[in-house]
């Protein structure tokens, strides 16, 4: 048996001689195991069956017809920095296998583990590329990097800096590179470690900026590069939004469904990061020719790198005014002419490339972060008079949605209205309902063309000689209706899934004043009781009913809908989405209907208590109190509502944005309308995508109770701010992307020209 421990696993650096040079046949390894540990296996990337790094270079962009899949320039630099792997000798393989077995046994003490990690990392000196890219040993190396001390980690990074891009572009090596960056991020809480970490990062960035195109266009390398950008910024390395994923918050903002705007566009930065290093790295990534940038725009992986870089520079307008012109391949701000300008020929190129999948994603992000002057220039020079043409394109329609959502003023809203509103029917028929939803949302946000938008949507769904009573069912089943050949014979589709975007459009519609949406209100309240019940059971349709109950529609109209749900509240409460509708109905109805709801929930109390949402709903509606003492329960309900009505009267309900209702008792049903109680679950109720689950547990706690980790986050933030609160040296202002780094001061953003 082999004895394994810190003493039996010393560093074997004395055995490393000239064989450490990077020579030998690429791809060979002595670790030809017949069977590999399933727990150590990594998933293949889609479309990538082998281990060859070159296979990851393939451009998988959607591709505009005028864009070449790869430029001649790229084919030249694509193979400039190829490394060949040397075989791993059996003794080295055995050494790391013993370490893996030792760590798996969980018999190593913390101090001994640190010594083993240090010795093993020292063993990789001069052979970092071979060991990091070995499919088996790379797993062990990841464990070592995650468990070593900071000085050992930084030493490994500095030693491997010259081959770091090659490691990052390898299928196995990319995981090692990411582990190294993640491990560095864990030490950022220690202010004393910043200088050491910055030195290690500088050694990596210096090599990357010498030839960034290879790494940007590689499927593995681009992912590592995005993590490196996040680390330099000081943000979480695992934020999905920074890796191209569209979050529910982004969709909520786009469709104007978000209640609070306080946290819009706020990027959580737990650490101060390395602003000088970020500037240096971005300068190197963007210092390429116009021809190279044309390729980077449409390459799947480099586009993601550019998107991450733009999101990290959010609200830094001065820097964005330098970065975005470089990405769009137009000249930076002309000093002789005030403001930012896009030439006509460049605007045409941007417009033609917009139909490319990767470039369309990139332009979406540009529109999200663009300063007002740049947005206005793009709107007038690129998009104006081409909105409908782009709206019906498979990729460009998402760009138009982003453009509409970030409209600055009513004048722009008017231009978009003139080009798109007359074509609402065409957009819906071609499945581009997202463009319609975005225009309706921005109309409500800018308070412009509200009535016209509502009327245009009615005209798109119902012909002139048709009754408007069918507007709601057709929007609920938008795809079924427009997919029907003979629309005059279309009927309600029982049991079918309701259209998510159609329901989102209706949620936006019910945010308008009731004066603009009477056809929609009439259509909803005129639906058959079984249709109303089916809508409430659907996860998307339930949100439409909730939006209607939260609107400023008349009290009698809301009551008419709630009455049609009578007899089904118990059944609805057993559904996760339906339980929210039950709660909304309870808040919006009179005492008689509240009793009916409580009675129905009491009948299903046993089954309801077993569901995820049941305990909260039973407690919120006080079903136990109703069961034991119904008279006292009724008195409490009246007292609660009366107290709230007095509060609204005293503090000016006319200025409130909340909807009104007067369902206190039977005697007060026809009185003046009052404001609906603000729902403590507003974030859940206004969740933008109906396919997502809504959870009650986190809302059942006291509102004043801080979220887990909130106190700790604030303490860390204060500590960091105190550590970085130093007087800034006065000096001349330099361009953001102006060249090379000057020194290693992390507080400096200046670069040599």
Swiss-Prot record:
Domain of life: Eukaryota
All copies of domain PUM-HD, residue ranges: 322-675
Ranges of biased composition (kind: Basic residues): 744-753
GO molecular-function terms, A-Z: RNA binding
Keywords from the named record: Nucleus, Repeat, RNA-binding, Translation regulation
InterPro entries named in the record: ARM-like, ARM-type_fold, NOP9, Pumilio_RNA-bd_rpt
Annotated stretches, region: Disordered: 1-84, 677-753
Bias (Basic and acidic residues): 23-38, 47-57, 73-84, 677-688, 699-712, 719-728
Protein purpose: Sequence-specific RNA-binding protein that regulates translation and mRNA stability by binding the 3'-UTR of target mRNAs.
Entry text on domains: The pumilio repeats mediate the association with RNA by packing together to form a right-handed superhelix that approximates a half donut. The number as well as the specific sequence of the repeats determine the specificity for target mRNAs.
Record protein name field: Pumilio homolog 23
Upper taxonomic lineage: Eukaryota, Viridiplantae, Streptophyta, Embryophyta, Tracheophyta
């Amino acid at each position: 048996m082999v004895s394994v421990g810190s003493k039996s696993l010393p560093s074997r650096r004395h055995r490393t001689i000239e064989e450490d040079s990077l020579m030998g046949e690429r791809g060979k390894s002595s670790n030809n195991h017949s069977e590999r540990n399933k727990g150590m296996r990594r998933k293949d990337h889609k479309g990538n069956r082998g281990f060859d790094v070159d296979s990851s270079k393939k451009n998988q962009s959607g591709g505009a017809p005028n864009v070449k899949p790869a430029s001649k320039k790229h084919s030249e630099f694509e193979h400039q920095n190829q490394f060949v792997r040397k075989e791993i000798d059996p003794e080295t393989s055995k050494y790391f296998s013993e370490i893996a077995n030792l760590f798996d046994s969980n018999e190593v003490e913390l101090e001994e583990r640190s010594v083993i990690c240090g010795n093993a990392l020292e063993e990789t000196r001069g052979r970092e590329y071979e060991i990091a890219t070995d499919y088996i040993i790379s797993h062990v190396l990841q464990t070592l990097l995650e468990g070593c001390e900071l000085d050992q980690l930084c030493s490994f990074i500095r030693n491997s800096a010259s081959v770091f891009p090659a490691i990052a572009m390898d299928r196995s090596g990319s995981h090692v590179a990411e582990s190294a960056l993640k491990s560095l991020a864990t030490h950022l809480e220690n202010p004393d470690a910043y200088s050491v970490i910055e030195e290690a990062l500088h050694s990596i960035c210096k090599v990357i900026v010498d030839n960034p195109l290879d790494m940007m266009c590689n499927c593995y390398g681009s992912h590592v590069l995005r993590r490196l950008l996040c680390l330099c910024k000081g943000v979480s390395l695992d934020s999905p939004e920074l890796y191209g994923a569209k979050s529910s918050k982004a969709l909520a903002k786009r469709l104007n469904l978000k209640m609070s705007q306080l946290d819009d566009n706020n990027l959580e930065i737990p650490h101060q990061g390395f602003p000088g290093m970020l500037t240096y790295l971005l300068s190197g990534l963007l210092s390429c020719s116009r021809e190279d940038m044309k390729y980077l725009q449409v390459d799947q992986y480099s586009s993601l790198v550019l998107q991450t870089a733009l999101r990290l520079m959010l609200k830094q307008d001065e820097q964005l005014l330098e970065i975005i012109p470089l990405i769009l391949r137009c000249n930076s701000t002309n000093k002789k002419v005030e403001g930012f300008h896009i030439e006509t020929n460049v605007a045409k190129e941007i417009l033609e490339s917009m139909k490319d999948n990767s470039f369309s994603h990139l332009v979406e992000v540009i529109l999200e972060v663009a300063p007002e002057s740049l947005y206005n220039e793009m709107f007038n020079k690129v998009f104006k008079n081409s909105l409908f043409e782009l709206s019906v394109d498979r990729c460009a329609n998402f760009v138009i949605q982003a453009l509409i959502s970030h409209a600055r003023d009513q004048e722009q809203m008017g231009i978009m209205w003139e080009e798109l509103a007359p074509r609402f029917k065409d957009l819906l028929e071609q499945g581009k309902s997202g463009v319609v939803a975005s225009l309706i949302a921005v109309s409500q946000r800018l308070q412009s063309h509200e009535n016209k938008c509502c009327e245009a949507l009615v005209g798109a769904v119902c012909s002139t000689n048709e009754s408007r009573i069918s507007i709601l069912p057709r929007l609920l089943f938008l795809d079924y209706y427009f997919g029907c050949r003979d629309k005059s014979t279309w009927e309600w589709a029982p049991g079918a899934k309701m259209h998510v975007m159609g329901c989102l459009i209706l949620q936006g519609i019910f945010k308008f004043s009731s004066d603009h949406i009477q056809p929609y209100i009439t259509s909803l309240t005129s639906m058959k009781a079984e249709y109303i019940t089916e809508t409430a059971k659907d996860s998307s349709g339930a949100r439409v009913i909730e939006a209607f109950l939260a609107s400023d529609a008349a009290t009698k109209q809301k009551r008419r809908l709630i009455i049609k749900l009578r007899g089904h509240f118990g059944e609805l409460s057993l559904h996760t989405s339906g339980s929210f509708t039950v709660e909304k109905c309870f808040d919006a109805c009179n005492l008689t209907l509240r009793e009916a709801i409580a009675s129905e929930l009491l009948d299903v109390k046993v089954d309801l208590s077993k569901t995820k949402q049941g305990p909260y709903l039973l407690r919120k509606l006080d079903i136990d109190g109703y069961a034991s003492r119904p008279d006292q329960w009724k008195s409490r309900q009246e007292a609660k509502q009366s107290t709230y009505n007095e509060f609204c009267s005293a503090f000016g309900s006319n200025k409130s944005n909340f909807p009104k209702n007067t369902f206190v008792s039977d005697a007060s049903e026809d009185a003046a309308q009052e404001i609906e109680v603000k729902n403590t679950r507003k974030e859940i109720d206004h969740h933008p995508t109906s396919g997502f689950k809504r959870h009650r547990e986190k809302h059942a706690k006291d509102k004043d109770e801080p979220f887990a980790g909130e106190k700790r986050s604030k303490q860390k933030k204060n500590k960091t701010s105190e550590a970085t609160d130093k007087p800034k040296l006065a000096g001349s202002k330099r361009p953001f992307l102006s060249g090379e780094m000057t020194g290693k001061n992390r507080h400096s953003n200046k670069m040599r020209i």
